[in-house]
From Swiss-Prot:
Keywords: DNA-directed RNA polymerase, Nucleotidyltransferase, Transcription, Transferase. InterPro entries: DNA-dir_RNA_pol_insert (IPR011262), DNA-dir_RNA_pol_RpoA/D/Rpb3 (IPR011263), DNA-dir_RpoA (IPR011773), RBP11-like (IPR036603), RNAP_asu_C (IPR011260), RNApol_insert_sf (IPR036643). GO terms for molecular function: DNA binding; DNA-directed RNA polymerase activity; protein dimerization activity. The gene is rpoA. It holds the Pfam family RNA_pol_A_bac. It comes from Rickettsia conorii (strain ATCC VR-613 / Malish 7). Its EC number is 2.7.7.6. Belongs to the RNA polymerase alpha chain family. This is DNA-directed RNA polymerase subunit alpha. The N-terminal domain is essential for RNAP assembly and basal transcription, whereas the C-terminal domain is involved in interaction with transcriptional regulators and with upstream promoter elements. GO terms for cellular component: cytoplasm; DNA-directed RNA polymerase complex.
Amino acid sequence: MLSLSKNWNTLIKPNKVAYENFPETNNKAKIVVEPLERGFGLTLGNAMRRVLLSSLQGAAITSIKIPAIEHEFSSIPGVKEDVSEVILNIKGIEVKMHVAEKRIMKLKATGPCVVTAGMIETGHDVEILNPDHVICDLAKDKQLEMELTCKVGKGYVLSTNSYEDNLPIGEIAIDALFNPVKSVTYKVENTRVGQVTDYDKLIMFVETNGDVLPEMAVGLAARILQEQLQLFISFEEQEEDKQVKTDTLPFSPYLLKRVDELELSVRSANCLKNDNIIYIGDLVKRTESDMLRTPNFGRKSLNEIKEILAKFNLRFGMDVPDWPPENIQELSKRYEDSYN
């Protein structure tokens, strides 16, 4: 019977996730994942994007209360904007909550002034992430008082679908955007593994409002997908699939990996092939001097390989006991899941 684990263990797995923040802010990041099987870049990119934009928990203002104002079609004395415009501006306030329970914030201002989100009294449990955000213009000698209710939730909740069924008279429900992720885009490019150049590289650009960092948002989205997909695994692995046979080797199974699977330049790969260096174990037993005596192998190729080996705590001139093993091809195939 075909081993079930062959369905996933024979696929190439991403071994590199790079996060790069933009210099002007920590709220934007470029995330690069590689290598992926061809087609998996689009599959994972689309799934991650949808989860990032819909399913993460965040905080938002869900209702406001202004003295003597009972609905959004009113006007506020001394305020240039009507209540509908004020509500629209309040929807743009980005908040972060440190507790799960709702909190009521207060705003008091005296004109003339431009009322901003930074004037809101939040207490210790809530932060305003965009304090310069404009709420309204207040005329001279006029006062504005307001209570704003802040809650934790997910997605986009319309005021008409608010879970606050019985708001007190004078309290106005507003649309709430809880999601801390503001935008997600992605693209897929080719990447190279060994001599194969058409694997996928997934590049995502994620921007948040500062409630969570992009790296954390991506991790949360991946965990959500993992939890949702777990139910579909309706079989048990065979015992042979569960066994990890690593107790008989006197060296790291990574040394059984073929050098043509490394991301080497064509020149370096050809030099190793011509010198009959097939496995990483063959490679690390050579000294730097040995390598520089290889025809057409120069200092640039040496530094390229040293950099790759260093990622796995390997180096030239290593003492590898019992290398090469007699059944090296069989061992390489058996342990391929350990080093991929």
